[in-house]
Amino acid sequence: MALTNSSISFRTVEKTKLEAYQVIEQYGLTPSQVFNMFLAQIAKTRSIPVDLNYLRPNKETLAAIDELDSGNAESFFIEASENYSAEEFTKRILNGGQ
């Protein structure tokens, strides 16, 4: 199978581009080489090789976490061996597991 070249175009903030290009240059690479390495890593690992830990939970999630931490969260049990449709499962959850 013959490999063919493809091009990608995207928009970015000029300041970010200039700062990134300076770093890339310090490594003795070109932006094209770095972007190709980035895409190859994504394809190889089936993941994005960027630290996404900066993602923060929203207000609702933080409130739910606080509720759990305080011990005031409503709990219920649904038998794992029982089979439910998505609709039945949702009804069970909304009815406190009943």
Curated annotation (Swiss-Prot):
Native source organism of the sequence: Haemophilus influenzae (strain ATCC 51907 / DSM 11121 / KW20 / Rd)
Role, per record: Antitoxin component of a type II toxin-antitoxin (TA) system. Its cognate toxin is YafQ.
Family to which this protein belongs:
Belongs to the RelB/DinJ antitoxin family.
Extract one GO BP annotation from the record: regulation of DNA-templated transcription
Pfam families in the record, alphabetically?
RelB
For this UniProt record, the keywords arranged alphabetically read as follows: Toxin-antitoxin system
Q: Which domain of life is it from?
A: Bacteria
Q: What is this protein called?
A: Putative antitoxin RelB
